[in-house]
Swiss-Prot record:
It is found in: Cytoplasm. This is ATP-dependent RNA helicase RhlB. PROSITE patterns: DEAD_ATP_HELICASE (PS00039), HELICASE_ATP_BIND_1 (PS51192), HELICASE_CTER (PS51194), Q_MOTIF (PS51195). Residues 392-421 are annotated as: Disordered. Residues 402-414 have a biased composition (Low complexity).
Length: 421
């Protein structure tokens, strides 16, 4: 975590449980990020928190630190049964749930509190086996959580701490009824510590906080630009015919160490993957159609650096904690203004710099005015020379289901192509 991203406030300055402080310092966390410095005084005093912060600013560690401290400082209810977790974290996607679980593991190891995962699409029996052994903290997506609850594999009657992460995304994905169903199975709001975190605190998110929390304190950490001042933004206006060639030319020019390319549909993502894989790039595909085990494998390969490029739909736009993403390409301008912010927020995280390149084609250029109004500034426009676009491109690979595979390893040096001045 970059020092420029941190405050002078140290975790050791708070009256945190010693085991929590020890675990944080062992992982190299000494100073708080702004959202952590704002949230911890409130949660340590037992106050509910609804927090807004740009992605990559330490929201996850803010609620995990608060949760572990609370559970260590407050006894579990008497005669708690093995199927009753003490804390629940709800996440909108499987990937985010898995990432939160990974972030929580060092704290769990240091404190002895047990973790459980519950997400759909994979591992029903494996997850259930862990739950049946008893967990203190359950992390999951709403559909699988409800499934286990209806089967009496879990009972939420002993919940002492609850976290709703990426609350705005929960609304976008249509999970609000599931969330309310789960809340109704918990003790009343004034008998638990409640935390909600979101990239935006819209009216509907605040309404949810009012319904399900106990007089929550609202905290916000937002840069002057919604997109973050460390992200260089750039916009091109290609024709539909030149769009793919422009993307491939830009990739050859930029030769990014680690890039994510976003498109608006899974079919467009598959098309992009086919072109890049055929051209020798180490590229992975992440859409809703990709099987869970392969999704996790692809994310792991991308995080390790075995893949240079990830092509993704907005299912992957939030909650991905991938370090050192250097470039984000918006192959399609998103229909939702907030998705633009979340997409390019994959780069320039935790104080690092990043580069976002957007293609405003004939089909999606109409989304640009609303995006620029939302972010509060115009995206700088760059020109390109159509005659300098790559032409020596191989025939794209076709995706054979259920394969989601990776392209061949990137070889050689980037080809030299120049933009117009």
């Amino acid at each position: 975590m970059s020092k420029t991203h941190l405050t002078e406030q140290k975790f050791s300055d708070f009256s945190l449980h010693p085991k929590v402080v020890e675990a944080l310092e062992k992982k190299g966390f000494h100073n708080c990020t702004p959202i952590q410095a704002l949230a911890l005084p409130l949660t340590l005093a037992g106050r509910d928190v609804a927090g807004q912060a740009q992605t990559g600013t330490g929201k996850t560690m803010a609620f995990l630190t608060s949760m572990f401290h609370y559970l260590l400082s407050h006894p579990a209810i008497a005669d708690r049964k093995v199927n009753k977790p003490r804390a629940l974290i709800m996440a909108p996607t499987r990937e985010l749930a898995v990432q939160i679980h990974a972030d929580a593991e060092p704290l769990a190891e240091a404190t002895g509190l047990k973790l459980g995962l519950a997400y759909g699409g994979d591992g029903y029996d494996k997850q259930l086996k862990v739950l049946e052994s008893g967990v203190d903290i359950l992390i999951g997506t709403t559909g699988r959580l409800i499934d286990y609850a209806k089967q009496n594999h879990i009972n939420l009657g002993a919940i002492q701490v609850v976290v709703l992460d990426e609350a705005d995304r929960m609304y976008d994905l249509g999970f609000i009824k599931d969330i309310r169903w789960l809340f109704r199975r918990m003790p009343p709001a004034n008998q638990r510590l409640n935390m909600l975190f979101s990239a935006t605190l819209s009216y509907r998110v605040r309404e949810l906080a009012f319904e399900q929390m106990n007089n929550a304190e609202y905290i916000e950490v937002e840069p002057e630009q919604k997109t973050g001042h460390r992200i260089k933004e750039e916009l091109f206006y290609p024709s539909n015919e030149e769009k793919m060639r422009l993307l491939q030319t830009l990739i050859e020019e930029e030769w990014p160490d680690r890039a994510i390319i976003f498109a608006n549909t899974k079919h467009r993502c598959e098309e992009i993957w086919g072109h890049l894989a055929a051209d020798g790039h180490r590229v992975g595909l992440l859409t809703g159609d990709v099987a869970q085990k392969k999704r996790l494998r692809i994310l792991d390969e991308f995080t390790r650096g075995d893949l240079d490029i990830l092509v993704a739909t907005d299912v992957a736009a939030r909650g991905l904690h991938i370090p050192a993403v250097t470039h984000v390409f918006n192959y399609d301008l998103p229909d939702d203004c907030e998705d633009y912010v979340h997409r390019i927020g994959r780069t320039g995280r935790a104080g690092a710099s990043g580069h976002s390149i957007s293609l405003a084609c004939e089909e999606y250029a109409l989304n640009l005015p609303a995006i620029e109004t939302y972010i509060g500034h115009s995206i700088p426009v760059s020109k390109y020379n159509p005659d300098a676009l790559m032409t020596d491109l191989p025939k794209p690979l076709r995706l054979t289901r259920p394969r989601t595979g990776n392209g061949p390893r990137r070889t050689g040096a980037p080809r030299n192509r120049r933009r117009s001045g």
